[in-house]
Amino acid sequence: MPGLALYDFGDSIRFGANSCAEDDDNYDKVELMLDYFEAYAKGFLSEAGDALNQCEIDNLAFSAKLMTFECGMRFLTDYLNGDTYFKTAYPEHNLVRAKNQFALVADMERKMEQMQQIIKSITE
């Protein structure tokens, strides 16, 4: 099944540009590391940029927030359903993961303009 570049980019940022592990419960420390975002975006666009259309390029920053929110919802849903999908190490593990992802989404919302500017500076 073919994938979507926005999903791949967004999930990579969700995991790779988070200042904390996805199950760190110190939510005040969770933030998007813009230098990691920029480095990944440069590499991604240098290799895949020619295969992307303008709409995809315009939505790269948003895709990071979308995939982070989606993963947070999946962790929360799994927690509410009795932890049947994701492997957990302790009873509230998926709840901690969800809160971590939602903290990252909140930081991405604060930094969205900067994220979009980074993409724009790379593609111009």
Where are these regions (language model features)?
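Weak global preference for isoleucine
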Residues: 13, 57, 118-122
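Active-site activation/catalytic loop segments of kinase-like enzymes and analogous catalytic loops
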Residues: 6-50, 66-85
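ATP/Mg2+ or Mg2+-diphosphate-binding catalytic cores
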Residues: 70-124
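Short acidic, Gly/Ser-rich segments with clustered Asp/Glu that frequently serve as metal-coordination loops
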Residues: 1-2
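Small/polar glycine-rich anion-binding or flexible loop at a beta-alpha turn
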Residues: 57-67
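Alpha-helical transmembrane segments
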Residues: 49-58
